[in-house]
Every structure is written in C-alpha cells, then in structure tokens.
Amino acid sequence: MSIQITAAKQSKSRSLEQRIPLLLRPIVRAYVLGYASSTAPRIVTLLLTHRSRRSENIEKKPDHASFRSALRILRGGLELQRFPAFCAAIVGGSTLFTKLISSFFAAWFSLKLLQSKKSDAFTEDIVYETANGRVLRPTHFAGRTMDLTLFSVTRALDVLIGEYWTQRKVARVSRGKWSDTDKLISTLADPAMFASSCALIMWAWIYTPDRLPRSYNKWIKSAAAVDQRLLLALRRMRYGEIKYGVETGQAPLLQEMCKQYGLPLEYGDPVQSIPYPCQVVHMGTGKNCEYHALSRFARSFLWAFSTYLPLNLVLAARKLSKKGFEKAVKSSARSSAFLGTFIALYYYGICLTRSRAGPHILGTSNAAYQQIDGGTCIGGGCALCGWSVLIENETRRGELGLFVAPRALATLFPRRYLKENQWRETLAFAVSTAVVFTCVSEKPARVRGVLGKLLKRVLGP
C-alpha cells in the first residue's frame, strides 16, 4: 500500500513538472530548491525554540508571535535580493543562453543580486577628514558573499585540475609512461588537499579565530577539548606577551591551570620553567606524550561515535536489516577513528615538535624554545593532523577535501574589504561558476560529489 502511495506521489510530481515549459524547468527547480534550503532550517529552528520554551516555561511567547515570525521567514525568502532569486537567476541565465558565456554573465548578475543587499554587519561609521573638519559617515564594506565565491573557486579548480590530470593520464598510459610517481600523486592528491586545508584551519583556530565562522570555532573547541588558558598562553607566546626567562607578569595564567591539574606551580612560570613541561599541555594525563596522544584518541573516538552512530542508524532505519545495521556501525567506527586520529595527531605533533624534534633542530636556548612554543610546535600539529583522512575510503577523502578547502581559503582573505574591490570577487565567482556549469553540461561526471549530482538534476532537461 505504501509503495502505491509513493508511486502516486511521484507520478503527481512528474505531471506537475511536465506542465512547466521545458526551458523554464531548471529555473523553477533552482528557485524551489533555494527557497527550501534558505527557509526550512530557520522554520525548524523556530519550531524547536517554540517547543522548548513551552516545555520549559521560559519567556513563554504567544502562539501568534511565533506564527508571525514563521510568516516573516517565508515572506523573506520570496524577496528579490535573497538566495532563491539568486539560484533562479544563475541557473536561468546559464540554461537560457549559450553555455560558458551565458553562465559567466548569469553568475555575475546573480552574485550582484546578493551583494546589493546592505547588511549592518558590513556597515561601519568611519571618521573622514573634510574641509569643514572631521565627519562621521557610514561606510559599506564588501565580503558578504566571500564564502560562496571561495566555494565556487574551489570547485572550478577541482574541475580544471581533475580534467588536466585525466588527459595527462590518458596520454601517458597510451605511451607506456604512467609511472609509480604518477600513481602516488593520484592517490595522495585528495588527502594532501584535506591535510593542507586542515593545517590552515587549525592554525587559524589557535592564532586568528576571528577568521573562522563562529560555529566552526565552537565545533573545533568541543572536539579538541582544550583548556582555554592554554590557548591564551600560546597566543601570548607568539605575540611576545610571554617570554622565556623574562618576568612579564604572565605566570598566574598557567599557574592557575597547574593548580587545577595537580602540577607544581613553577611549571606555569616562564622564568622558572624553560620550556613549559609537556605535562601542562597534557592537562592532567601524565608525562608521557605517546600516552597522552592515545588517551586523546580514545576520548575523541567515543565522543564522535556517540554522535555518528545514532545519525547513521536513523539513516539506515529506512531499510532496517542486519546488513544495514552492520554498515551503520562500521561507517560510524571508521569516521570516529578518523576524527580520533585527527585530534591525536594534532596533539602529538605539538609534543613531537616541542620535546623531540624541535630542540635537536633549533637548539635549547631561551630564544629557540621561544620560537618553538611561539608557533613552530603548533605548525607541527597542523602539518600532521589532516593525514588522518587516509583512514577514510577514497571517495570520502575527496568529499572531505572539497568540504574544508573553501573554509581554509577563507582564512587567507579578509572577511570585509572595500567596496571598490568587489569586482574582483565577482569576476572570480563568475569565471568559476561558468567553468563548473559548462562542465556539468559537457562532462557531468567531472563535477564530483553531491554538488555534481545536484547540478545535473537541476540543469538537466
């Protein structure tokens, strides 16, 4: 009976779609998808908040207030300067006109549509010197669409580099010159992309957290489970506020931490302890760096497994079977092992640089230890952690690499910049989108992952 109902719904959906002119179908699909993706999460959040407030009797709001909020969200999604219109414009322009050039102009126009909406977060009152003295004027900055642009650039580079490498492989195989080095590069390309991206992200998390989204900072903080006083000390070491062998009044910061974890107070004094002992970094798990790394792996594995397993079981519940259950458990275990190894390698890389490799290479002077704890040790952890992706299967490595790459690139660019430079971002987005959309039309398999399937579905007839 349920199969018949599902078939009837699918038939009704197809008949509804067939009433739309063939040329306009991709535009309608894109608009509906954009509208759903921009409004559904906010509606769900509103419902959950409303339900939570009712159950906990916290600031109970009238039902009509929640209804007005939901209506405002639904109406907001229909505005011209919102994401659904952006989706329809970019897809419509690329399907109604010639592929590459039309995609370029469609992308340019659609991004301009998003950029035209002013935001308080990108507006600041700045003092200007005029003939009549100083004047305070509101100045609008660009950068609202930077994440979208970097995502587009990343996918375009993946398409271009992937196509070049495929053509190169065909040519070299036909001439019998495909070497073991070429095979190794093919195998390690995605892991290297992930590892280098994670290195940038983890470096930014330590030293420039404002370059990462707030939610990203919060998630890494939860996964890493690091004492915030230790993070603060690392930043002060890098920027010269804490110096080994010099009294700067910063000893109480880590001495409080030492007291909490049962360590001697002198361990937290940069004058008495040069360098800080690794026990401080281990946060109460003992002196041995290898044991600390293993304990980090175990704790992170259990934390991740308790998150991944319920999600995978829910996904497997649609076709509940012994095989589906085993697959859910194995998938959860593999992903948890990946995350546990990531965190363990990060911490072990720090210890390896501080107590093993660093002193042998840079020396044991105060200046050398200052250099090690002022950034070199963090660099060691950043360089190692991302290679944990080798635990995942080949397809998953590519997906993870493409997921983190735009976020890593975002750490290299300012979150806000002057309006007069916005054309550069728009140009980068337009060119990148034109490349990706043209590739979807000509070689859809080249656009990897969920994005490739989604664009093929939206842009297809």
Place the predicted regions along the sequence by residue.
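Glycine-rich, hydrophobic membrane-spanning regions of integral membrane proteins that mediate transport
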Residues: 1-461
